[in-house]
Amino acid sequence: MSIKSDKWIRRMSEEFGMIDPFEPNQIKEADGKRIISYGTSSYGYDIRCANEFKIFTNINSTIVDPKNFDPKNFVTVEDDCCIIPPNSFALARTVEYFRIPRNVLTVCLGKSTYARCGIIVNVTPFEPEWEGYVTLEFSNTTPLPAKIYAGEGVAQVLFFESDEICETSYKDRNGKYMGQTGVTLPKA
């Protein structure tokens, strides 16, 4: 299994729609201002956060149960940024839609710009033949409110190509998060 380069990521995205929309360069400025970078890097792709957020709330005092998740645990916000309360959590989705080849597995890591502020980005691997918008999980580990910017980089996806094709892909087993189009809540 080997990590894939910028040339491979560019070719797979431009010829096969692996990432859509795809940015072939590393973007660090918008409207003359510095932003948290996104786009193609040497051995990965920095994904952006869309402007759709779900922020945890305790207004309804329900229990967080991954097998029986109550959507009332979240407040939905659509904005250019999201303020996550201290020691709290939010979900978002990527701007980019992914189509992962059958012989590829990705690992997604949060950007250090956010990590250095106490904001942890968690994303599970994108499995072979999974496709959809990625649901992003943000944890604010600080005692202060934390800001997430829509349209800017939040995490980096690394692509690993296997030496052989898997017997059963995510698509083959009808994975429950296949084709997700927005922020997707837990499914048991």
From Swiss-Prot:
The keyword Heme does not apply. It comes from the Bacteria. CDD domains: trimeric_dUTPase. Its EC number is 3.5.4.13. Keywords: Hydrolase, Nucleotide metabolism, Nucleotide-binding. One of its GO terms (biological process) is dUMP biosynthetic process. It catalyses: dCTP + H2O + H(+) = dUTP + NH4(+). GO terms for molecular function: dCTP deaminase activity; nucleotide binding. Catalyzes the deamination of dCTP to dUTP. Belongs to the dCTP deaminase family. Homotrimer. This is dCTP deaminase. The gene is dcd.
